[in-house]
Amino acid sequence: MKLAVLGVCVSLWACAAAAGPGDALDEVMHSLAQRRHGEVSFVEQQFLSLLKRPVESYGELIYDAPNRLEKRTIEPRAETLVVDGETVTVQRGRRSHTLDLKAYPQLLPFVESIRATLAGDRAALERLFRLEFTGSEVRWTLDLRPLDAELAKTVADIRIEGSRDELSRVEIRQPDGDRSLMTLRAHSGR
Protein backbone atom coordinates (compact mmCIF):
# COMPACT_ATOMS: atom_id res chain seq x y z
CA MET A 1 0.00 0.00 0.00
CA LYS A 2 2.79 2.41 0.94
CA LEU A 3 4.45 1.71 -2.41
CA ALA A 4 1.20 2.48 -4.23
CA VAL A 5 0.83 5.78 -2.36
CA LEU A 6 4.48 6.60 -3.00
CA GLY A 7 3.98 5.76 -6.68
CA VAL A 8 0.96 8.08 -6.89
CA CYS A 9 2.89 10.86 -5.11
CA VAL A 10 5.84 10.50 -7.46
CA SER A 11 3.49 10.51 -10.46
CA LEU A 12 1.72 13.63 -9.22
CA TRP A 13 5.03 15.34 -8.53
CA ALA A 14 6.26 14.46 -12.03
CA CYS A 15 3.06 15.79 -13.58
CA ALA A 16 3.31 19.00 -11.57
CA ALA A 17 6.94 19.43 -12.55
CA ALA A 18 6.11 18.81 -16.20
CA ALA A 19 3.20 21.25 -16.08
CA GLY A 20 5.21 23.90 -14.24
CA PRO A 21 7.06 25.48 -17.16
CA GLY A 22 3.87 25.47 -19.26
CA ASP A 23 1.99 27.16 -16.46
CA ALA A 24 4.77 29.73 -16.03
CA LEU A 25 4.77 30.33 -19.79
CA ASP A 26 1.00 30.85 -19.68
CA GLU A 27 1.46 33.31 -16.79
CA VAL A 28 4.12 35.24 -18.72
CA MET A 29 2.01 35.27 -21.88
CA HIS A 30 -0.97 36.51 -19.87
CA SER A 31 1.13 39.30 -18.29
CA LEU A 32 2.50 40.33 -21.68
CA ALA A 33 -1.00 40.37 -23.20
CA GLN A 34 -2.16 42.86 -20.54
CA ARG A 35 0.34 45.47 -21.67
CA ARG A 36 -1.14 47.58 -24.46
CA HIS A 37 1.79 49.95 -25.02
CA GLY A 38 5.48 49.96 -24.31
CA GLU A 39 8.57 52.02 -25.09
CA VAL A 40 12.12 50.88 -24.43
CA SER A 41 15.57 51.91 -25.55
CA PHE A 42 17.74 49.33 -27.26
CA VAL A 43 21.36 48.60 -28.03
CA GLU A 44 21.82 46.09 -30.83
CA GLN A 45 25.06 44.32 -31.60
CA GLN A 46 25.48 42.31 -34.78
CA PHE A 47 28.28 39.77 -34.67
CA LEU A 48 29.21 38.93 -38.26
CA SER A 49 31.92 36.47 -39.25
CA LEU A 50 33.24 38.90 -41.87
CA LEU A 51 33.96 41.60 -39.27
CA LYS A 52 36.42 41.67 -36.38
CA ARG A 53 34.15 43.78 -34.17
CA PRO A 54 30.39 43.81 -33.76
CA VAL A 55 28.31 46.42 -35.56
CA GLU A 56 26.47 48.39 -32.88
CA SER A 57 23.35 50.51 -33.16
CA TYR A 58 20.98 52.04 -30.66
CA GLY A 59 17.59 53.67 -30.53
CA GLU A 60 14.13 52.89 -29.22
CA LEU A 61 11.37 50.35 -29.73
CA ILE A 62 7.71 51.29 -29.44
CA TYR A 63 4.98 48.69 -29.26
CA ASP A 64 1.23 49.24 -29.53
CA ALA A 65 -0.92 46.14 -29.10
CA PRO A 66 -1.71 44.00 -30.81
CA ASN A 67 0.38 44.35 -33.95
CA ARG A 68 2.28 47.63 -34.27
CA LEU A 69 6.01 47.63 -33.65
CA GLU A 70 8.30 50.57 -34.38
CA LYS A 71 12.08 50.45 -34.26
CA ARG A 72 13.73 53.88 -34.35
CA THR A 73 17.46 53.61 -34.85
CA ILE A 74 19.34 56.76 -33.84
CA GLU A 75 22.96 55.69 -34.35
CA PRO A 76 25.00 54.89 -36.40
CA ARG A 77 22.45 56.35 -38.86
CA ALA A 78 18.85 57.36 -38.41
CA GLU A 79 16.32 54.83 -39.63
CA THR A 80 12.74 54.02 -38.72
CA LEU A 81 11.17 50.63 -39.31
CA VAL A 82 7.44 50.30 -38.65
CA VAL A 83 5.51 47.04 -38.76
CA ASP A 84 1.79 47.75 -38.65
CA GLY A 85 -0.34 44.70 -39.28
CA GLU A 86 0.89 43.23 -42.56
CA THR A 87 2.68 46.40 -43.71
CA VAL A 88 6.37 47.15 -43.20
CA THR A 89 7.67 50.69 -43.78
CA VAL A 90 11.35 51.60 -43.70
CA GLN A 91 12.35 55.26 -43.67
CA ARG A 92 15.89 56.61 -44.03
CA GLY A 93 16.13 60.36 -44.25
CA ARG A 94 13.57 61.51 -46.80
CA ARG A 95 13.32 58.13 -48.47
CA SER A 96 10.58 55.73 -47.50
CA HIS A 97 9.85 52.21 -48.72
CA THR A 98 6.71 50.22 -47.90
CA LEU A 99 6.15 46.54 -48.48
CA ASP A 100 3.55 43.90 -47.75
CA LEU A 101 4.75 41.37 -45.20
CA LYS A 102 2.83 38.64 -47.04
CA ALA A 103 5.07 39.19 -50.08
CA TYR A 104 8.18 38.53 -47.94
CA PRO A 105 7.33 35.43 -45.88
CA GLN A 106 10.96 35.06 -44.78
CA LEU A 107 10.54 38.24 -42.69
CA LEU A 108 7.46 37.04 -40.84
CA PRO A 109 9.25 34.87 -38.25
CA PHE A 110 11.61 37.71 -37.28
CA VAL A 111 8.70 40.11 -36.88
CA GLU A 112 6.40 37.63 -35.16
CA SER A 113 9.04 36.42 -32.71
CA ILE A 114 8.99 39.84 -31.07
CA ARG A 115 5.48 41.04 -31.91
CA ALA A 116 3.70 37.83 -30.84
CA THR A 117 5.79 37.64 -27.67
CA LEU A 118 4.91 41.24 -26.77
CA ALA A 119 1.25 40.49 -27.50
CA GLY A 120 1.38 37.38 -25.32
CA ASP A 121 0.16 35.38 -28.33
CA ARG A 122 1.43 31.87 -27.65
CA ALA A 123 -0.63 30.37 -30.50
CA ALA A 124 1.02 32.69 -33.05
CA LEU A 125 4.45 31.68 -31.75
CA GLU A 126 3.58 27.98 -31.88
CA ARG A 127 2.53 28.27 -35.54
CA LEU A 128 6.12 29.22 -36.44
CA PHE A 129 8.35 27.88 -33.69
CA ARG A 130 8.97 25.09 -31.24
CA LEU A 131 8.92 26.81 -27.85
CA GLU A 132 11.22 26.02 -24.93
CA PHE A 133 10.50 27.98 -21.78
CA THR A 134 12.68 28.06 -18.67
CA GLY A 135 12.43 30.08 -15.50
CA SER A 136 9.46 31.64 -13.80
CA GLU A 137 7.35 34.74 -14.31
CA VAL A 138 9.95 36.73 -12.36
CA ARG A 139 12.82 35.84 -14.71
CA TRP A 140 12.32 33.81 -17.85
CA THR A 141 13.87 32.65 -21.12
CA LEU A 142 11.93 31.67 -24.21
CA ASP A 143 13.81 29.80 -26.94
CA LEU A 144 12.17 29.70 -30.34
CA ARG A 145 13.29 27.16 -32.93
CA PRO A 146 11.81 27.34 -36.44
CA LEU A 147 9.37 24.60 -37.40
CA ASP A 148 9.86 25.27 -41.12
CA ALA A 149 12.97 23.64 -42.66
CA GLU A 150 13.46 26.54 -45.10
CA LEU A 151 13.39 29.07 -42.28
CA ALA A 152 15.82 26.95 -40.28
CA LYS A 153 18.37 27.58 -43.05
CA THR A 154 18.24 31.27 -42.13
CA VAL A 155 17.53 31.22 -38.38
CA ALA A 156 18.94 28.62 -35.99
CA ASP A 157 17.02 30.00 -33.03
CA ILE A 158 15.75 33.09 -31.31
CA ARG A 159 16.21 33.53 -27.56
CA ILE A 160 14.06 36.06 -25.74
CA GLU A 161 14.70 36.87 -22.08
CA GLY A 162 12.57 38.90 -19.77
CA SER A 163 10.95 39.52 -16.44
CA ARG A 164 7.20 39.55 -15.96
CA ASP A 165 5.76 41.62 -18.84
CA GLU A 166 9.08 43.10 -20.00
CA LEU A 167 11.58 41.81 -22.53
CA SER A 168 15.24 42.43 -21.67
CA ARG A 169 17.16 40.65 -24.46
CA VAL A 170 16.50 39.26 -27.91
CA GLU A 171 19.20 37.15 -29.53
CA ILE A 172 18.88 35.82 -33.07
CA ARG A 173 21.37 33.13 -34.08
CA GLN A 174 21.95 32.05 -37.65
CA PRO A 175 23.19 28.62 -38.73
CA ASP A 176 26.45 30.14 -40.06
CA GLY A 177 27.35 31.49 -36.60
CA ASP A 178 26.37 35.11 -37.23
CA ARG A 179 24.09 36.53 -34.57
CA SER A 180 22.48 39.70 -33.32
CA LEU A 181 21.89 40.63 -29.71
CA MET A 182 19.43 43.34 -28.76
CA THR A 183 19.47 44.53 -25.15
CA LEU A 184 16.34 46.41 -24.05
CA ARG A 185 16.00 48.89 -21.19
CA ALA A 186 12.93 50.67 -19.89
CA HIS A 187 13.04 54.42 -20.29
CA SER A 188 13.95 56.24 -17.08
CA GLY A 189 11.04 57.70 -15.17
CA ARG A 190 8.82 54.76 -16.06
Which residue ranges define each predicted feature?
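Amphipathic hydrophobic-ligand
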Residues: 53-59, 157, 178
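Short beta-strands and strand-coil junctions in structured, solvent-facing domains, enriched
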Residues: 49-50, 77-79, 149-151, 167
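Flexible, processing/modification-adjacent segments and terminal tails
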Residues: 20-48, 52-54, 92-147, 154
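Gly/Pro-enriched, hydrophobic low-complexity segments
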Residues: 122-128, 135-190
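Short hydrophobic/aromatic-rich beta-strand segments that constitute the beta-sheet cores
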Residues: 42, 69-73, 88-90, 142-144, ...
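N-terminal signal peptide c-region/cleavage motif recognized by signal peptidases
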Residues: 11-16
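Sec-dependent signal peptide recognition
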Residues: 2-8
